[in-house]
């Protein structure tokens, strides 16, 4: 059911997980190697509503009081994923750099949350130029808010 809900959200234009907010890294064989989902933080509540409605309908759970992971004033990286078979090839770095360029075109810094229990991911983000801007909690997990500003 979760997979079906997420597929529906990707297919919509008014969802935080919309194909319109997604960069896809493809291999030479047209396999999906990785994805990066990002959107204007000012639109979080508007874009999240599709998930809230879908979760109520699919699971009977109300997520309307979920913590905000972003705010206005940044291009927020919601999700970054590289398939296991394609890791270690610089795909995450390429997706991040393309997303940072998107933020530059929008005249916004690019931000993300990284779980404090994932120092390897934080090292990757910092190696690209992200810097620590504050602590946050999301989904009950302590998170670190990182941003990279336009040069």
Name each region found by the language model.
Residues 1-22, 27-28:
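Active-site rim helix/loop that mediates acceptor-substrate recognition in acyltransferases
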Residues 20-22, 72, 77, 109, ...:
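Short coil/loop residues immediately preceding or within conserved phosphate-binding loops
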Residues 24, 31-40, 76, 81:
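Conserved beta-strand in the GNAT
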Residues 39-75, 79:
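Conserved acyl-donor/pantetheine-binding loop and adjacent beta-alpha core of acyl/acetyltransferases
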Residues 41-43, 111-113, 126, 131-145:
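Conserved catalytic-core motifs of GNAT/GCN5-like acyltransferases
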Residues 73-75, 87, 103-116:
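Conserved GNAT acetyl-CoA-binding A-motif
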Residues 82, 88-101, 123-127:
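Conserved acetyl-CoA-binding loop-helix of GNAT-fold acetyltransferases
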Residues 92, 96, 118-121, 138-144:
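Short glycine/proline-centered loop/turn elements that form peptide/ligand docking sites
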């Amino acid at each position: 059911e979760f997979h079906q809900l997420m597929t529906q959200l990707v297919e919509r234009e008014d969802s935080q997980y919309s194909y319109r907010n997604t960069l896809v890294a493809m291999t030479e064989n047209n396999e999906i190697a990785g994805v990066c989902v990002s959107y204007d933080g000012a639109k979080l509540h508007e874009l999240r509503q599709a998930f809230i409605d879908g979760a109520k309908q699919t699971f009977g759970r109300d997520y309307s009081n979920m913590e905000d992971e972003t705010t206005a004033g940044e291009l927020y990286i919601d999700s970054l994923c590289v398939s296991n078979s394609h890791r270690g090839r610089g795909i995450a770095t390429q997706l991040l750099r393309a997303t940072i360029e998107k933020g530059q075109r929008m005249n916004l810094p690019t931000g993300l949350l990284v779980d404090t229990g994932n120092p390897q991911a934080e090292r990757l983000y910092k190696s690209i130029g992200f810097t620590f801007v504050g602590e946050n909690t999301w989904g009950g997990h302590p998170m670190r808010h990182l941003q990279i500003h336009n040069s």
